[in-house]
UniProtKB/Swiss-Prot annotation:
Xref: Pfam families: RNA_pol_A_bac, RNA_pol_A_CTD, RNA_pol_L
Intracellular or extracellular location(s): Plastid, Chloroplast
Record's subunit section: In plastids the minimal PEP RNA polymerase catalytic core is composed of four subunits: alpha, beta, beta', and beta''. When a (nuclear-encoded) sigma factor is associated with the core the holoenzyme is formed, which can initiate transcription.
InterPro entries hit by this protein: DNA-dir_RNA_pol_insert (IPR011262), DNA-dir_RNA_pol_RpoA/D/Rpb3 (IPR011263), DNA-dir_RpoA (IPR011773), RBP11-like (IPR036603), RNAP_asu_C (IPR011260), RNApol_insert_sf (IPR036643)
EC class name: transferase
Name of the protein described by the UniProt record: DNA-directed RNA polymerase subunit alpha
Originating species: Capsella bursa-pastoris (Shepherd's purse)
Amino acid sequence: MVREKVKVSTRTLQWKCVESRRDSKRLYYGRFILSPLMKGQADTIGIAMRRALLGEIEGTCITRAKSENIPHDYSNIVGIQESVHEILMNLNEIVLRSNLYGTRNALICVQGPGYITARDIILPPSVEIIDNTQHIATLTEPIDLCIELKIERNRGYSLKMSNNFEDRSYPIDAVFMPVQNANHSIHSYGNGNEKQEILFLEIWTNGSLTPKEALHEASRNLINLFIPFLHVEEETFYLENNQHQVTLPFFPFHNRLVNLRKKTKELAFQYIFIDQLELPPRIYNCLKKSNIHTLLDLLNNSQEDLIKIEHFHVEDVKKILDILEKK
């Protein structure tokens, strides 16, 4: 069998932000380039990045509203200019930023007459509003309006499925997509077989994160998808005629985890709680959510186990190890 040689660029790949602007509180734009790439690589990366940007990044939305004033979602309330449906649509458009996990409660409690805007939402500490001026409703008479809200962090979108409003609670269509649009284009340069490519990537976000933050998060998510292919402890790849065997490496931090287990007795581990480790809040919340409460629980998990935890990244393992090795 004849195999063609595959040319690989010896130049270091570099990325750069060539344009960044804020068109409004709820519209950010960024343009990035990555080069030099071999022919075909730019399209491969561009397609994967666009899908990750639009589908893999989490966002925070209001997903449910509840009020004793609301009989049903297409009704009108005396003293309020907007219909209930319009109020729910306005709540749907509120842009939020958070690092929360699970569901949180928020509240609107206003006395009319006056305008209700996003500024009037009483939020939990982990959530912030991007644009306080977003309109919710107009109270035309001196009435009290209280609306309980549910806030969630997720990815993709969630369409309301239930029409059962017996508890006066109304689901809201949620679009958990901070990236509003993403495009890629390719510029080729060079002659003949020496042609190389530059990838141009354009990103528009809703202001809950910048295009640069979106690019970093999408990249991390793609890396996490491919990491399982790098972790094969016992398996080997057999090449043609079984002449050579190549064993795939452990996860990069595997040996550090093993050494930590050897250094300290398990008896001590079970009395050290992760609360004492001064971990970053996001990492701490991920571990607690996975029923990891002590150092023994933590070290009984391999790196492969840890990165399977929702919202957990490879660099989080390094951060944990750095903290543990200083203790």
